[in-house]
């Protein structure tokens, strides 16, 4: 899909949390393990590509239902050293992992000892799909299936 920013982004500066980031919460799921199963089931990633990454997260103690972020729009305070650390580690995790930004960013935030509530929320009353400052054209192929299963 594609993202088009149609509203002022300045409004999101006040949303940035203590870690220096503000992100949309996932509109349906709150677990990277369920998300990994969904994207595999939908054919968006192969099991052989995501399984080692998920096994690593399990072995390190990443809890189920810890939270899940949608990474299509992120507000960042580039003067915040924590934000820079998270972004650098996220890049490496993404580069060396299954190329699923939602899984790797959520893991990196958890691995650094932060809680989901330390990350600012873009559109606190909703999510990316109902944010009036964003037009999000998702690929129609998977959209119906993605919204069916919450994984609870």
What function would you assign to each model-found segment?
Residues 3-152:
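Glycosyltransferase catalytic domains, chiefly GT-A lineage
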